Amino acid sequence: MTNKIKIGHVHMSGCTGCLVSLADNNLGLIKILDDYADLVYCLTLADVRHIPEMDVALVEGSVCLQDHESVEDIKETRKKSKIVVALGSCACYGNITRFSRGGQHNQPQHESYLPIGDLIDVDVYIPGCPPSPELIRNVAVMAYLLLEGNEEQKELAGKYLKPLMDLAKRGTSGCFCDLMYDVINQGLCMGCGTCAASCPVHAITLEFGKPQGERDLCIKCGSCYGACPRSFFNLDVIPEFENINEIIANALKEGESDD
């Protein structure tokens, strides 16, 4: 590949589980870094003090309002990035950090946390606690094709990313209640159980073929809403499903035998 894009990982208040999920791509991650992207910022992996110019910023974690450096960092990330991706449910919806009230070690004064979309404009949401390695990998490949691919590749990349861009436009709330209002109560649920399978705390069970949520267990991560095939209807993606999978597979295979 002639033109590699610049990708950065910006860590806010989170557990680093999303970065671990990214690393779980193993050879797929190496392939992306070899051929498609330069990792120009990542506090966990690289000694870079200041946020640089980036094509794609993967932001993990919510923003602590009492940590003024974090507030400035997220604003700086928006200024210096072409595409900002909320990586994981803490960045998308606040997740379990919404329940923080301060008093914890080592920063007892840190008591208020917001999803990044409450402070800046976000282009793409990747919900999940954590998101699957495959989803993160696919978004990275599609971001490259959107910025550096030919016209056909850019069109397919746009169609693939559209549902995740629509999630970003929807807002910063995500819980089983949204699934209940938008899907179940509208008669759209087909009882597939994907929402229950995606819940990281097992707050959703299937009762008589329909999902039932335990509000006391829900951590507001939005994984169920993002995973539900009926939470959005994207007629652009469905006819292109095979082409999109093929273009991702080809991108990851290309150049494997160049040694």
Curated annotation (Swiss-Prot):
EC top class named in words: oxidoreductase
Catalysis: reaction(s): oxidized coenzyme F420-(gamma-L-Glu)(n) + H2 + H(+) = reduced coenzyme F420-(gamma-L-Glu)(n)
Chain residues that bind [4Fe-4S] cluster 1: C189, C192, C195, C228
Domain of life: Archaea
A GO molecular-function descriptor: coenzyme F420 hydrogenase activity
Cofactor: Ni(2+); iron-sulfur cluster; FAD
Transmembrane segments: none
Binding positions ([4Fe-4S] cluster 2): C199, C218, C221, C224
Record keywords, A-Z: 4Fe-4S, Electron transport, Iron, Iron-sulfur, Metal-binding, Oxidoreductase, Repeat, Transport
PROSITE patterns: 4FE4S_FER_1, 4FE4S_FER_2
Enzyme Commission no: 1.12.98.1
Function: Reduces the physiological low-potential two-electron acceptor coenzyme F420, and the artificial one-electron acceptor methylviologen.
Subunit relationships: Pentamer of two alpha chains, two beta chains and a gamma chain.
Family to which this protein belongs: Belongs to the FrhG family.
Protein name in the entry: Coenzyme F420 hydrogenase subunit gamma
Organism: Methanosarcina barkeri (strain Fusaro / DSM 804)
